[in-house]
């Protein structure tokens, strides 16, 4: 069949509503119209009936086997009469509704009257190529209605775009290829997500183990402090007890001594009472009277009042400590209120309403500077190929030269990254950086980012808790959750980074002499303190944290160059 990409509404290529009379294998032309059939015609009719029964039997067999179209089986010629010598069909005629081998197809190729018939690849079952409404072969495709039609359907589809079946197949095959590619892409993304999730499960176990270790250590210190406080209190009470007992024993000894002295005085008085000499009596009694001590020591030890005060201090301190311990549970319950857990199983802090602000977004550099925040690079997180200078305000990728940094759990092992020492939480912040070289990334991430992993979710462009902006030497690209968004923004050496934590906004601005140009804005879901994050992926990349007192330079012909 000749190619026909588009067919105008109207009659379709020649096709009859009913199949024409079968062809004679000998003559190669249709039988003449007459009242009686020739022997050849009778033979053809008999053959057609026989072949029709065979086709029905084959179709029923195919249907029983769950293959109604007979796909996957060899299609035989309907005109080969000997069942043992039937030849494989090479074409099917949609007009005749018959399959032909190479020999029996020749009449369709040489007879001009048969050349208008619609030929296709061999099909086992012709019923599905037959219009159920008009009993005519399906010979075209209606694009708006997305269905195959016959010649008689043309009136019903008047005004529609109609193409040949071959053209429709080519179009649908192209669409199928696009669908396959899209499905393969989605499958790859899904497999990558599964891979990242499996890798993250290990990170979850490590993170939880680290938190457990910290909790055990902290509670161990707390228990040790409680035991020490208990020992100190008991020692204090024992010392007070010994002091009070010692004081009581001293008073007792003194009183016993006074009792003995008073017993002597009593005996002396009895002796003087027996003196008959008046002068002697008066002299001795007056002498005794002058030496008599009539004072008595206090027999009350005021320890009970002191103990009451000590008991009050211990009780109040204990109640306060218990309240502090109960705050552990309350704070954990607040964290667990988060409905969605991040892939790192992070917990969400509830931002207090007092931190929300209704102030408008800043638009000029002067307005941004109201939220100026001074940050520095954290040397405990810097990769061993990153050199920190200028009081930790400049970082340079010195690959392959390593720096003698101590091996710490917080240090990045694979990705050339470094975080800020300062966290960003609950408020608005603004800082500026200068970038040098293609392959630099500036962004935010959470503290729980994996420091030792080699997977993409360990870098600030490959997970759903980091947001970053990349300069690739030609343009900027925004990264989130391993998905990139090319940006149409001019090159800028100095970038302004604005964070509105309560509003969930992270914006990057190109900072020039007299203008602030928005490069990209992220809508974020901040649920814990975040940190400024930097990735220097190539050798000699450099990033410098700008002193906000420095005025931006006037634009130069090449803004983002190599590191000075």
UniProtKB/Swiss-Prot annotation:
Subcellular locations according to the entry: Cytoplasm
Modified residues (Phosphoserine): 116, 203
GO BP, sorted A to Z: positive regulation of DNA-templated transcription; positive regulation of interleukin-1 beta production; positive regulation of keratinocyte differentiation; positive regulation of retinoic acid receptor signaling pathway; response to growth hormone; response to retinoic acid
Residues that, per the record, bind Zn(2+): 131, 134, 153, 157
PTM statement from Swiss-Prot or TrEMBL: Phosphorylated by ULK1.
Regions annotated as coiled coil: 165-203, 243-274, 320-340
Enzyme class: transferase
Zinc finger (B box-type): 72-122, 126-165
Protein name (database record): Tripartite motif-containing protein 16
Organism placement in taxonomy: Eukaryota, Metazoa, Chordata, Craniata, Vertebrata
């Amino acid at each position: 069949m000749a190619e026909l990409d588009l067919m105008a509404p109207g009659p379709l290529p020649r096709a009859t509503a009913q199949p024409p009379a079968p062809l004679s294998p000998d003559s190669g032309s249709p039988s003449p119209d007459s009242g009686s059939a020739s022997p050849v015609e009778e033979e053809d009719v008999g053959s057609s009936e026989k072949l029709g029964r065979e086709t029905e039997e084959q179709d029923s067999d195919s249907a029983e086997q769950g293959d109604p179209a007979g796909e996957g089986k060899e299609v035989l010629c309907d005109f080969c009469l000997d069942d043992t010598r039937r030849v494989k069909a090479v074409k099917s005629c949609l007009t005749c509704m018959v399959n032909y081998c190479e020999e029996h197809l020749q009449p369709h190729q040489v007879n001009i009257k048969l050349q208008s018939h619609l030929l296709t690849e061999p099909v086992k079952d012709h019923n599905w190529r037959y219009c159920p409404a008009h009993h005519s072969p399906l010979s075209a495709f209606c694009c708006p209605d997305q269905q195959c039609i016959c010649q008689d359907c043309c009136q019903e589809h008047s005004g529609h775009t109609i193409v040949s079946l071959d053209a429709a197949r080519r179009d649908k095959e192209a669409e199928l290829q696009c669908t396959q590619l899209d499905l393969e892409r989605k499958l790859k993304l899904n497999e990558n997500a599964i891979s990242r999730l499996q890798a993250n499960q290990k990170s979850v176990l490590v993170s939880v183990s680290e938190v457990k270790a910290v909790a055990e250590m902290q509670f161990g210190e707390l228990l040790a402090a409680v035991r020490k406080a208990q020992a100190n209190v008991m020692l204090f009470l024992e010392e007070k007890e010994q002091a009070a007992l010692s004081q009581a024993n001293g008073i007792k000894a003194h009183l016993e001594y006074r009792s003995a002295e008073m017993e002597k005085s009593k005996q002396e008085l009895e002796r003087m009472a027996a003196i008959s000499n008046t002068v002697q009596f008066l002299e001795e009694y007056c002498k005794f009277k002058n030496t008599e001590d009539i004072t008595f020591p206090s027999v009350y030890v005021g320890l009970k009042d002191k103990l009451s005060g000590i008991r009050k201090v211990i009780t109040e301190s204990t109640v306060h400590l218990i309240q502090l311990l109960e705050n552990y549970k309350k704070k954990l319950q607040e964290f667990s209120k988060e409905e969605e857990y991040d892939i790192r199983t992070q917990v969400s802090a509830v931002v207090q309403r007092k931190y929300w602000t209704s102030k408008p977004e800043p638009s000029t550099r002067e307005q941004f500077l109201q939220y100026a925040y001074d940050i520095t690079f954290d040397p405990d997180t810097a990769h061993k190929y990153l050199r920190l200078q200028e009081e930790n305000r400049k970082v340079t990728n010195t690959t392959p030269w390593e720096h003698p940094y101590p091996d710490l759990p917080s240090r990045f092992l694979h990705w050339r990254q470094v975080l800020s020492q300062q966290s960003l939480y609950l408020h608005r912040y603004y800082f500026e950086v200068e970038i040098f070289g293609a392959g630099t990334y500036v962004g935010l991430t959470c503290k729980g980012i994996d420091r030792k992993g080699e997977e993409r979710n360990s870098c600030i462009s490959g997970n759903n808790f980091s947001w970053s902006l990349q300069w690739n030497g030609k343009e900027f690209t925004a990264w989130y959750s391993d998905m990139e968004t090319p940006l149409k923004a001019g090159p800028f050496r100095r970038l302004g980074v604005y964070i509105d934590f309560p509003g969930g906004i992270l914006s990057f601005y190109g900072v020039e002499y007299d203008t602030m140009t928005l490069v990209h804005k992220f809508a974020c879901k901040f649920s814990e303190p975040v940190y400024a994050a930097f990735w220097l992926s190539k050798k000699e990349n450099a990033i410098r944290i700008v002193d906000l007192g420095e005025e931006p330079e006037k634009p130069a012909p090449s803004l983002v160059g190599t590191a000075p």
